[in-house]
């Protein structure tokens, strides 16, 4: 599994399982709202009054309506900031 998928899939799956309403902002600024019905490598199926298939490459941000508890893979990616004095 690609490193990017190790966080994305558990996050989207938690949103789908718990049926948490989301706002999805597209790269062109459009805001879509609904619940994630399904997703795969390339698209998210968003459920509202109608179902919309949204291509992931068009998505800028996914904002849940409430906090999400999910178990993403925790990897040491060496992006921690140095402690004070260790610059």
Curated annotation (Swiss-Prot):
- What GO molecular function annotations does the UniProt record carry, in alphabetical order? RNA binding
The record's annotation in Gene3D superfamilies points to: 2.30.30.100
Q: Which PROSITE patterns match?
A: SM
Specify the Sm domain's residue ranges. 9-68
- Keyword annotations from UniProtKB, A to Z: RNA-binding, Stress response
Record Pfam families: Hfq
Quote the InterPro entries the UniProt record gives.
Hfq (IPR005001), LSM_dom_sf (IPR010920), Sm (IPR047575)
Q: Report the protein name in the record.
A: RNA-binding protein Hfq
Lineage of source species: Bacteria, Pseudomonadati, Pseudomonadota, Gammaproteobacteria, Alteromonadales
């Amino acid at each position: 599994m690609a490193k990017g998928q190790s966080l994305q899939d558990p996050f989207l799956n938690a949103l789908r399982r718990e049926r948490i309403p989301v706002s999805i902002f597209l790269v062109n600024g459009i805001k879509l709202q609904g619940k994630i019905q399904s997703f795969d490598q390339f698209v998210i199926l968003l459920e509202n009054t109608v179902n919309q298939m949204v291509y992931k490459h068009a998505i800028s941000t996914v904002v849940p309506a409430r906090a999400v508890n999910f178990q993403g893979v925790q990897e040491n990616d060496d992006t921690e900031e140095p402690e004070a004095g260790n610059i």
